[in-house]
């Protein structure tokens, strides 16, 4: 009986380890990682670090920097990791930034070109990110001239905020965080890294930062390195760091 129970325990442990490795495999080709940690699920601010993968493992690049996240904190999103429910779960309009591991999508901005090798979208006055759940264009940046005005009807995310929102500069530079690429209804949409209005202003679900930090990220990110974006509360990061093969964070992580 004891041998039988021991065998069950070994098999259970092995299965759990394999599952963790399988999850980490989804970003095993990542050579660059942008890591944001927050003090907890309800915090609206965090710390951003950048890492490059070397033969010796993850190496921190540059200095940690402050960022702001959702006004209501963070919640598990839909990215490269398996869906989780050991914490809040991201929903459309909940004012939370999605937590997990995500591919980094195209860069975007108001200028015709940017200092980046990432795919870049020069935004126009007719570009919208559709946040209307149930729309075929849900969670997509589209040009109303191409998809038609009706396709963006009801969307609250014009990408040229300087034109549509009284000179707002927050989308002057940014990049897409690939949350909910499968367009799950009410799963959350239009998640970006973008400029902050001020260090004290949290977001409606994105991650915001100083212009100098954004410029450093855009110049550093390389599409051939398959960069990923990680956002986790510190307790969740500590719990998942080894299994998800994430960088070990330095001290003073606040």
Give names to the regions the model predicted.
Residues 4-14:
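Bacterial N-terminal signal peptides
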Residues 209:
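A conserved hydrophobic position in a structured secondary element of the catalytic/binding core
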Residues 20-204, 212-254:
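Cell wall/extracellular polymer interaction/catalysis modules
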Residues 15-19:
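Short, intrinsically disordered, charge-balanced linker/junction segments flanking boundaries
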